A protein has these predicted regions:
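Metal-coordinating catalytic core of metallo-dependent amide/deamination hydrolases
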Residues: 2-66, 166-186
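A broad, low-specificity signal for short, low-complexity segments enriched in glycine/proline
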Residues: 34-37, 119-122, 159-161
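Histidine-rich, glycine-flanked metal-binding segment
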Residues: 41-70, 77-133
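Glycine- and acidic
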Residues: 72, 129-132, 164-170
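Redox-cofactor binding/interface segments in oxidoreductases and associated redox assembly factors
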Residues: 125, 137, 161
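Histidine-centered divalent metal-coordination motifs
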Residues: 129, 134-143
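Active-site loop-helix segments enriched in His/Asp/Glu that coordinate
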Residues: 140-186
Length: 186
C-alpha cells in the first residue's frame, strides 16, 4: 500500500487525529480526537478527485431513494457531544442526516448508510474548515459586554444589533451612537 507524509495528507484532506488547529487569531487550539472517515478512501470534490459518478457517487441511487442533497467533505466538526472529529457531514431535506463517512457504498468501505452520495448530491469541500453548531441573534440591545459570555455559553456565536451600555438609548433601540461610545463598549 502506498503511503504519503502527514504533511501531504494534511494538504490534501485537512488535519486528522492528533493534529492541532489554531482557532482564528487566538491562542486557543483544538486537537482532532477521532477521524470518522476511512484513510485512503476519502471523498474529495474537484477535477480528477473521487466525488464523481461510479467512484464516490453511487450511480445506483437517486435522491428519492435517500441519497444526500448536500455533503460537506473532510470537515473538522467541533461538537459538545461528539468532541473534535474529522468527518463528512450530510444534509438531506435541509437537515443534518449524519456525521461520518460519506460516499458510494458499492465500492467504498465504511460508508454510513445515511451518508450515501449520488449524482443528486451537491458538495462543499471542508478540508480546511471547521463546522460547529451555532446560533445567530439578529436583534440585540448591547447593554453590557457580559452579554457576549451569556450568549456563547448558550450556543449563540453571532450577534447583530447595537447599543453602548445600560442607557435609555440602548435599552430602547439597537442603535450605536458614535465612535467614542463604541470604543467604550468594546
Amino acid at each position: 500500500m502506498a503511503t504519503i507524509s502527514r504533511q501531504e495528507y494534511n494538504n490534501l484532506f485537512g488535519p486528522t487525529v492528533g493534529d492541532k488547529i489554531r482557532l482564528g487569531n487566538t491562542d486557543l487550539y483544538v486537537e482532532i480526537e477521532k477521524d470518522l472517515r476511512e484513510y485512503g478512501d476519502e471523498v474529495v470534490y474537484g477535477g480528477g478527485k473521487t466525488l464523481r459518478d461510479g467512484m464516490g457517487l453511487a450511480n445506483t441511487m437517486t435522491s428519492k431513494e435517500g441519497s444526500l442533497d448536500l455533503v460537506i467533505t473532510n470537515v473538522t466538526v467541533i461538537d459538545p457531544l461528539l468532541g473534535v472529529v474529522k468527518a463528512d457531514v450530510g444534509v438531506k431535506d435541509g437537515k443534518i442526516a449524519g456525521i461520518g463517512k460519506s460516499g458510494n457504498p458499492n465500492i467504498m468501505h465504511g460508508v454510513h448508510p445515511d451518508l450515501v452520495t449520488s449524482a443528486a448530491t451537491d458538495a462543499i469541500s471542508g478540508e480546511h474548515l471547521i463546522l460547529t453548531a451555532a446560533g445567530i441573534d439578529g436583534h440585540v440591545h448591547m447593554i453590557s459586554p457580559q452579554q457576549a459570555y451569556a450568549c456563547l455559553s448558550n450556543g449563540i456565536t453571532t450577534l447583530f444589533g447595537g447599543g453602548v451600555g445600560p442607557t435609555d438609548g440602548s435599552n430602547g433601540t439597537t442603535i450605536t451612537s458614535g465612535r467614542w461610545n463604541i470604543e467604550q463598549i468594546l
